[in-house]
Amino acid sequence: MAIATEVTSSPTRQSIAALLAEARERTLALIGPLGDELLNRTYSELLSPLAWDLGHIANFEELWLVQTVGGLPPLHGDLGQYYDAIENPRRDRGELPILHDAELRAYMSEVRERTLEVLEGVDIAPGAEDPLLREGFVYEMLVAHELQHQETMLQLLQMLDVPYRPAEADRERFEPVPIDEGGPQPDALRFPAGTYEIGAPDRGFAYDNERPRHAVELAGFEIDRTAVTNASYMQYMGETGAEPPMYWERDGQGWTRTAMGITAPVDPMRPVVHISWHEADAYARWAGKRLPTEFEWEAASPHLDGIGGAWEWTSSDFRAYPGFAAFPYNEYSVVFFGDSYKVLRGASWATHARVARPTFRNWDLPQRRQIFAGLRLAEDAR
């Protein structure tokens, strides 16, 4: 996967409408093979029913692009309370009185119609008075929000008990790395001690937690050019008795992986995925190395291979950058800052390229395994 580059041109109403349409087309393609029963089913307390995700996508769009920007009333009164991700834990969302089936699809369409009507009358120029609209920020935010939920939906689709293979899952996004007789031995990249610029520039869309761009002093470090592969993780399991990644099962002397209702042999040349931070940290210690900090990862990112196979756990807690300012709302970043969440960097095969920028900070609880997460090794400079 190509990492997104810095945006240097301002969006237009036409380009924004096209981005919204592209994101929605991709969302609908993901659920296209599914019937309403599968959309409404709760598969795990860790993930919402797909119907909730779809309604949340539409309701979030209505909140920001119709109500906040357009000043229009909601279509369904207090429906938004059921799609509040903070107030409604994932384990409870299947019991909420949310929209389903034809009513849900109609709501998504009606919200989009109102969104496009409001878009025609707003100022999205670089000099727009409202920072929410300046350079189309709020529209870029809504596109990113939908794209990120697509990855969450793909996490649930891994749990399907019927065969399903969306077009996105067929795309090969990771180039196998060479493996010698002793196991995977990726080259290490060396970075000297010094000052490195971290964070997103002022121009172009980025989330509040990616800013402000600032200088960070780093000690010298080494980081592997490629992520840890399944072959290397198999060796680790064999020597330590560690649990296999989520969805793996023993098949004689080998391993299979069952996801999206399809069972296939584990490809040893692919990056290991579906492991928790605790498992990644334990592997790194077994290998005599450590997880990189998120700043080390970002400094090295232009030189890393294999980004886009799996999110990569870092050793860093999710904290605000110096000079951080919440925008446009606290619930995206602020409520998660602290030592409870670990930062992941990079992207997975399920991540859209618009999200996969080198400054993007993903985060999750260290025990989570259903996310598309693996690791890359680092160590102090020798």
Predicted regions and their residues:
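Surface-exposed recognition segments
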Residues: 211-214, 241-246, 305-382
